[in-house]
């Protein structure tokens, strides 16, 4: 009898443990710089109380990056990396593009033909999780998205509940309501994606009014000035000092409300629109978190907040996401959940491609053998500050070989080899002393406090010649390690 009782106790405990497997709510927005938020940028005027509360109750990662892209739609490469856990040169392209924008995409030694079987939802399905997603359509890893058991995708960038971000929240709320009604106790992975604040940034009338912005449609006029509009970014420029390397790029010339303008009125209005869309997203996240709390699931749920890449909107005289400055290469990254110390911060040095390994680690699932990412769990649990010491970035969606970046510690190198060799530039920044990556052109502006005289591109300063050489050698090493098919003008061809 004692043996039977003990056996029954073991079974009961085992079942209870199974019920307590953590849920995951992965929130991802489209086109958002980390510097939109006060917890990354004290100058920001965005109100995002729900996300700010997540940051206060969880961990903020100061060094979260997306590795880059080989196509103008940066989100395509970014979302392939998120879903697969693989590096930028080891992922497929969308099937319609022939030849693929990634020259390695059809090489089975670098991109496994059956990769989709080992993408995020497929892995969690096999582990007994219920999987659901809502997000925008297009510029994504379509076959991986289909692995989610429940899929509600649509592009919603309007200013009403039906045409905007509330639509995505409703899909999640409906899903949670159905689980509650069915008394479904399986753990869940919800990929809670938004179409905003990617343009067209049509906010709700109330939030547009709050930020002094209008949905400007007339290409021949400037939007009205309004004192409520957010201030210009501290590293705003009226134009970038040299060509970014992608002629005719949509984000540089065709975004409604901005087009090719970088003047103060246009940029402040567009940031107001960005903030209106972002605060509306914040409200929708709050609705979902309230539902989880009412269901008794909130404390057993890991919540991740991030974006598929950053965004310029006037910073350095740029508009889109096709650059490697920190405002665009970096992404916001906040995690709250069991075992994470409230109000904590860490450098992290995490890529978005580490999502698969990280979520597997938090859920106690073994990552697939195709995964190349690292788990952020040691950092989230307070056992480490970073998971790697070197970060690599690429953009070559325009002229080749494009831009490359590498960061280690406080030092960052960016190299440009674009426009068929007519633009070849090197930038070297000490991010501790120059976190806004000020360049010479910033020193002549009167909009802001004049930058420190040493807050410059140091690439041509003889005092830093050794550091430049060191970083260039590190960049080449990373390009080789990651199977980058291109080489810059001053690199060996192998």
Residue positions per predicted region:
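Bacterial Sec-dependent signal peptides at the C-terminal "C-region" and cleavage site
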Residues: 9-20
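Active-site-proximal cap/lid insertion segments
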Residues: 18-22, 29-45, 53, 62, ...
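Active-site segment of extracytoplasmic enzymes that catalyze sulfate/phosphate-ester chemistry
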Residues: 15, 26-27, 33-119, 123-135, ...
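Short, solvent-exposed loop/turn segments at the edges of secondary structure
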Residues: 75-77, 143, 326-330, 371, ...
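Bacterial N-terminal signal peptides
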Residues: 1-10
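Low-complexity, glycine/alanine/valine/leucine- and proline-rich hydrophobic stretches
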Residues: 409-427, 431-433
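Short, solvent-exposed turn/loop segments enriched in Gly/Ser/Thr/Pro and often Arg
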Residues: 40-44, 60-86, 94-95, 133-144, ...
């Amino acid at each position: 009898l004692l043996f039977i009782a003990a056996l029954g106790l073991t079974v009961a405990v085992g079942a209870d443990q199974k019920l307590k497997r953590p849920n995951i709510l992965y929130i991802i927005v489209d086109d958002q710089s980390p510097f939109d938020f006060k917890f990354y940028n004290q100058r920001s005027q965005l109100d995002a109380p729900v996300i700010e509360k997540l940051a206060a109750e969880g961990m903020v990662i100061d060094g979260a990056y997306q590795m880059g892209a080989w196509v103008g739609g940066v989100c395509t490469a970014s979302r392939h990396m998120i879903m697969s856990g693989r590096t930028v040169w080891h992922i497929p392209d969308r099937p319609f593009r022939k030849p693929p924008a990634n020259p390695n995409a059809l090489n089975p030694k670098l991109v496994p033909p059956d990769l989709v079987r080992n993408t995020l939802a497929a892995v969690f399905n096999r582990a007994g999780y219920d999987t659901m997603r809502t997000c925008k359509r297009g510029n994504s890893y379509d076959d991986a998205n289909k692995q989610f058991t429940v899929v509600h995708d649509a592009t919603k960038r309007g200013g009403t509940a039906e045409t905007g971000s509330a639509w995505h929240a409703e899909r999640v709320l409906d899903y949670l309501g159905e689980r509650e009604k069915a008394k479904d106790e399986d753990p869940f992975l919800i990929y809670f994606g938004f179409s905003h604040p990617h343009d067209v940034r049509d906010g709700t009338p109330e939030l547009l009014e709050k930020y002094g912005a209008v949905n400007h449609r007339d290409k021949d006029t400037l939007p009205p000035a309004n004192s409520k509009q957010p201030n210009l970014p501290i590293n705003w420029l009226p134009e970038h000092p040299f060509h970014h390397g992608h002629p005719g790029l949509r984000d540089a010339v065709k975004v409604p409300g901005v087009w090719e303008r970088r003047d103060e009125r246009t940029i402040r209005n567009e940031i107001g629109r960005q903030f209106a869309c972002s605060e509306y997203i914040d409200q929708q996240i709050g609705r979902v978190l309230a539902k989880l709390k009412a269901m008794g699931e909130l404390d057993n749920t890991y919540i991740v907040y991030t974006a598929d890449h950053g965004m310029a909107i006037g910073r350095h005289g740029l508009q889109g996401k096709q650059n490697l400055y920190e405002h665009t290469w970096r992404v916001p990254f906040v995690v709250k959940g069991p075992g994470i110390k409230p109000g904590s911060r860490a450098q992290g040095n995490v890529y978005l491609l580490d999502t698969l390994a990280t979520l597997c680690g938090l859920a106690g699932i073994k990552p697939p053998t195709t995964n190349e990412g690292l788990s952020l769990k040691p950092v989230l649990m307070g056992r480490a500050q970073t998971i790697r010491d070197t970060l690599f970035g690429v953009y070559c969606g325009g002229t080749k070989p494009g831009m490359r970046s590498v960061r280690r510690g406080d030092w960052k190198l960016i190299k440009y080899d674009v426009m068929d060799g007519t633009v070849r530039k090197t930038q070297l920044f000490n991010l501790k002393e120059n976190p806004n990556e000020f360049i010479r052109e910033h020193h002549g502006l009167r909009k802001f406090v004049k930058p420190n005289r040493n807050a410059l591109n140091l690439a041509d300063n003889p005092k830093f010649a050794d550091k430049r050489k060191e970083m260039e050698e590190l960049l080449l090493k990373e390009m080789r390690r990651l199977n980058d098919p291109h080489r810059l003008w001053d690199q060996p061809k192998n």
